[in-house]
Amino acid sequence: MYQDLIRSELNEAAQTLNNFLADEANILAIQQAAQLLAASFKADGKVLSCGNGGSHCDAMHFAEELTGRYRENRPGYPAIAISDPSHLSCVSNDFGYDYVFSRYVEAVGREGDVLLGISTSGNSGNIIRAIEAARAKGMKVITLTGKDGGKMAGSADVEIRVPHFGYADRIQEIHIKAIHIMIQLIEKEMASV
């Protein structure tokens, strides 16, 4: 009954992945992001991750697999997803939703830390403010974006951009794969300490 729709969805996902994979810059960006994160961890830094909606879930997923585990048992790495409901609701109420991530970065971000900002459009105002706050703190910035990178294009030390202009779920599918590969590479980098 829905087999054609299922095949179509899987084919579109595969095509989006193949398009991403065809650009060597994307492969290098994932590698550079993982190396930047591992260097921060080796220097006693941490990563703060943030996103909205499904990207918020990806930010939490990323932090959880760094502090917990990915595939193998190993020491946890210092990762915090900016997701505390009391912080988010307080800042949203008192300052506005555009400040929910930047206020947290201002409070706990330090020079040598890394911010991972995730936005499929690249236009999320609260992620842009978090990037600005991270820069003011001397932090490095990695972004996961989509389409043309939006307003976030060019704002990161490392940008992993999925150049898909359709629905956001295709971009998110590549983001989660990039996240998993980054964690795998971080583990390899940290094992060489």
UniProtKB/Swiss-Prot annotation:
This is Phosphoheptose isomerase. It comes from the Bacteria. One of its GO terms (biological process) is D-glycero-D-manno-heptose 7-phosphate biosynthetic process. CDD domains: SIS_GmhA (cd05006). Its cofactor is Zn(2+). Disulfide bonds: none annotated. Homotetramer.
